[in-house]
């Protein structure tokens, strides 16, 4: 009876998780596209209202004209739409699914005795600690390095090193399948933490300042933008980590940590290609094909590495 109920819980939670993830990723990708595609307004009325960018689009038989204000709009509308439940429900359903699939049966799915033989309670505690410790370390990197000269580059390198270390540890402590999923959950937890602890609180402070007739502190917009950009680069690595559970040849490799890092790097590079492609179409930057090339090359490198291992064992 228990296994039957767990199967149903797994199915329903997985379904809900996919639905909410699609909603979150869709809205996130749209706003990255929107920010990258805005052009200075031509209408003088818009300029006088403080509009810094506009976009004209056609979709579904209608024309759309979203605008972005440089600071605060002259007046807030009665119905102001917020984007946060997409993130929160994705994390809640994802962690629930992780609990049902891995933590509930830690001895079977989380632990591989040939990798590390430990008590299920200890493995569960360390798995949860992975989610929390990574977020704290990542947050400190953003705080301490983000405002320095070349801060974005320093943060990028710091976070990349942190992800590599976490990937190596996970693959040497847990079963390969669980390790890949855990790294995906770790990054996804950080993405939702960015929304809950920085993006939304900053936006609430901005709204409160406007309602009080006070100037808006630009630091909230800067911090929110920084974390939002990080989230968009985490997205494709997270998707690979989640989907890898269906392909045992990735996580069963002796150097599975290296395969995981290479594929996540490919995802981040490919995402960079699409982000910069919007600016290229407007003449703001060079063609981002090198990022696509790097991302695509990482995939056959991973394939070659996996194939070489299979050949040695045939």
Identify the function of each model-found stretch.
Residues 28-72:
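Membrane-interface amphipathic/juxtamembrane segments adjacent to transmembrane helices
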Residues 66-82, 217-221:
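Cytosolic juxtamembrane amphipathic/interface segments immediately preceding
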Residues 103-220:
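Long, contiguous internal "core" modules enriched in hydrophobic/ aromatic residues
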Residues 91-106, 168-172, 178, 235-252:
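Alpha-helical transmembrane segments and their membrane-interface junctions
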Residues 304-311:
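Conserved small/polar residues in nucleotide/adenosyl-binding loops
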Residues 133-139, 266-276, 300-303:
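Alpha-helical transmembrane segments
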Residues 148-157, 252-256, 280-296:
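Membrane-interfacial entry segments at the cytosolic side of transmembrane helices
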Residues 15-42, 187-202:
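Hydrophobic alpha-helical membrane-embedded segments
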């Amino acid at each position: 009876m228990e296994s039957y109920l767990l199967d149903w819980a797994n199915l329903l939670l997985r379904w809900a998780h996919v639905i909410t993830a699609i909603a979150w990723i869709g809205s996130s990708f749209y706003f990255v596209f929107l920010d990258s595609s805005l052009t200075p307004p031509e209408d003088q009325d818009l300029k006088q209202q403080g509009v810094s960018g506009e976009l004209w689009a056609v979709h579904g038989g209608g024309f759309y004209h979203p605008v972005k204000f440089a600071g605060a709009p002259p007046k807030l509308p009665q119905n102001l739409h917020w984007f946060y439940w997409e993130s929160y429900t994705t994390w809640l359903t994802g962690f629930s699914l992780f609990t049902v699939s891995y933590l509930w049966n830690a001895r079977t799915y989380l632990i591989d005795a040939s990798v590390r033989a430990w008590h299920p309670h200890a493995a569960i505690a360390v798995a949860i600690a992975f989610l929390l410790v990574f977020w704290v370390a990542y947050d400190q990197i953003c705080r301490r390095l983000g405002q320095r000269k070349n801060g974005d580059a320093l943060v990028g390198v710091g976070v990349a090193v942190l992800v590599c270390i976490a990937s190596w540890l996970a693959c040497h402590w847990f079963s390969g399948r669980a390790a890949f999923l855990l790294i995906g959950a770790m990054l996804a937890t950080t993405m939702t933490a960015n929304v809950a602890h920085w993006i939304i609180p900053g936006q609430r402070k901005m709204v409160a300042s406007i309602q009080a007739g006070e100037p808006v502190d630009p630091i909230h917009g800067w911090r929110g933008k920084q974390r939002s950009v990080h989230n968009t680069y985490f997205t494709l690595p997270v998707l690979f980590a989640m989907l890898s559970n269906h392909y045992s040849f990735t996580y069963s490799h002796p150097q599975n940590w290296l395969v995981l890092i290479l594929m996540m790097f490919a995802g981040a590079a490919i995402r960079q290609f699409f982000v910069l492609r919007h600016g290229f179409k407007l003449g703001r930057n060079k063609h981002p094909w090198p990022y696509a090339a790097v991302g695509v090359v990482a995939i056959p490198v991973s394939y070659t590495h996996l194939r070489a291992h299979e050949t040695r064992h045939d």
